[in-house]
Amino acid sequence: MLFRSLEAEKGNLHLIDTVLDKIDIVFDGADQIDKGKNLIKGGGGALLRENILINAAKKVVIMADESKFVTNFNRDVPVEVHPLARNTVTKNISKIGGRPKIRTLDRGYPFITENGNIILDCNFGVIKKPKQLREKIKNISGVLEVGIFTRKPDIIYKARSAGKFDVIK
């Protein structure tokens, strides 16, 4: 990232600072939102950066259509993993009840994040205790980030049909 930032500056392009302290507000989406306003994010593969930005933000605003709202999470949890740790992380996620599979591109190659890591999409069935599961996964050596975000958004815009929406605070 530092090299890209320096190259961009040569072309008079200004990128986001690579050393973040505080951000006023983050607007983002979510793959799922549970009844406790926890989020599953990372379907696009940028979960490490998304989590850094959300945790640096003074205010977090999430926008999602009504299909993304669930009582309990029931979709795969993205887990960003250092490539060297893929096999051990896969075994350890299986030990805590997950069914991990490496995210691949259409042509069968592994999906590589913008940070050079891989994503394991992990099925845990219905997740009733997301914070505890996040902590278990995060404690596995080689796991860089988990797609369960437990920082509660300040505002959620829930899009409904016909252009209507609800504001959840």
Name what the model sees in each region.
Residues M1-L2:
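Short, small-residue-biased leader/transition segments that mark boundaries at the very start
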Residues L6:
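Binding-site signature for planar aromatic cofactors or substrates
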Residues E9-K169:
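Conserved phosphate- and dinucleotide-binding cores of soluble alpha/beta proteins
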